[in-house]
């Protein structure tokens, strides 16, 4: 689906017309530059590759430097591909936050905050042991049994255990656009979005 790249600025709250206090996320959206146009005839599908945030040439690999030179645009730090754009677009076109409008509903894709290696209580919401006394020793937050006896004699895939938590791709769907601020390239969406402040997001219609 069509969309743009953006950067999470932080959270705030605004009042609705009914006087309700709405939590919302401020996202800096664009300007995004078209770095590649994919067509049905040449590539088998139609899409736009967009670049976001200027990068220094010394920090750009040679293949990417050639890619940007071919498109006649400055090197970009972040690239993403979006399908099903309407209308004609050519290399070097600039798309900004005016691509969205008030009351739109968008999907936001980002990388969640990494929490490191966590146990089952924090990672999966296990309740822990019920009896905290009467001889119980250091098993308060243990996962308990992970399998049966001699049959099936294995631990099934997908069993909830301790492990790496967060730092994964997360999509939040149907967030309402509260306000578009083109003079500052800002987009206010209702609710929270994944990632820390300054993280890169994909905002899709």
From Swiss-Prot:
Transmembrane segments: none annotated. SUPFAM superfamilies: Translation proteins (SSF50447). InterPro entries: Ribosomal_uL3, Ribosomal_uL3_bac/org-type, Ribosomal_uL3_CS, Transl_B-barrel_sf. The keyword RNA-binding applies. HAMAP family: Ribosomal_uL3_B (MF_01325_B). One of the primary rRNA binding proteins, it binds directly near the 3'-end of the 23S rRNA, where it nucleates assembly of the 50S subunit. This is Large ribosomal subunit protein uL3. It comes from Porphyromonas gingivalis (strain ATCC BAA-308 / W83).
């Amino acid at each position: 689906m069509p969309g743009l790249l953006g950067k999470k600025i932080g959270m705030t709250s605004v009042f609705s017309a009914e006087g309700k206090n709405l939590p919302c996320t401020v996202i800096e959206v664009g300007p995004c530059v078209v770095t590649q146009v994919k067509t049905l005839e040449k590539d088998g599908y139609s899409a736009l590759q967009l670049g976001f945030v200027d990068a220094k040439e010394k920090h750009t690999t040679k293949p990417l430097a050639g890619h940007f030179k071919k498109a006649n645009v400055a090197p970009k730090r972040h690239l993403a591909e979006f399908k099903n754009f309407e209308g004609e677009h050519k290399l070097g076109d600039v798309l900004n936050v005016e691509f969205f409008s008030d009351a739109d509903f968008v999907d936001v894709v980002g990388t969640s905050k990494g929490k490191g290696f966590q146990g089952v209580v924090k990672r999966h919401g296990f309740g822990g042991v019920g009896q905290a006394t009467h001889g119980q020793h250091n098993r308060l937050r243990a996962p308990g049994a992970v399998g049966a006896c001699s049959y099936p004699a294995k631990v099934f895939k997908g069993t909830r255990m301790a492990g790496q938590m967060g730092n994964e791709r997360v999509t939040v769907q149907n967030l309402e656009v509260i306000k578009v601020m083109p003079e500052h390239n800002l987009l206010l969406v209702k609710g929270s979005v994944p990632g820390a402040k300054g993280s890169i997001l994909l905002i899709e219609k």
